[in-house]
């Protein structure tokens, strides 16, 4: 089983790229599944805190606080989100052979996923000169800063246009296919 981990700051195109990568992998005969480490946080926001699920009004401050300040720091459950992800992958691996995780941001996440699975590629998306509309506090949060401190990405994709993302997804799939042959 192959696992692709997509990293990047807010609004760098992680979900869009994940969908493009999924489509390219399907064209090569794979059965890919797009997943999110933070799925439990989104579930909490929707089910208990009245978020409507609209990406345009994502409760980023809530997600950051719940994931870091409460779950990791206050409750000491550093691996909570990763463990939930691993359980979901274990269950879903009956139906899928490739997993695309579109929201990794922490060095600990990259390292732990690489330890947990044998065949992992970590991809960073960069979107320079883009107004992400985050508050200064959100921009300074560890989940926005740590992604730039990791130095061992397998691929770095510059997101200037949709074509850049599509070309990057195709290039990665072709590179990975040539490694198999």
What are the functions of these language-model segments?
Residues 1-4:
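Extreme N-terminal starter segment of soluble prokaryotic enzymes
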Residues 8-9:
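P-loop (Walker A) phosphate-binding loop of NTP-binding proteins
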Residues 14:
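Conserved lysine of the Walker
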Residues 17:
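Hydrophobic positions on the alpha1 helix immediately C-terminal to the Walker A/P-loop
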Residues 23-33:
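Post-Walker A helix-loop "phosphate-sensing" segment adjacent to the P-loop in P-loop NTPases
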Residues 33-96:
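ATP-dependent small-molecule kinase phosphotransfer cores
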Residues 84, 116, 121-181:
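Small-molecule kinase domains that catalyze NTP-dependent phosphoryl transfer to phosphate-bearing small molecules
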Residues 109-115:
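A short acidic, amphipathic alpha-helical/loop segment
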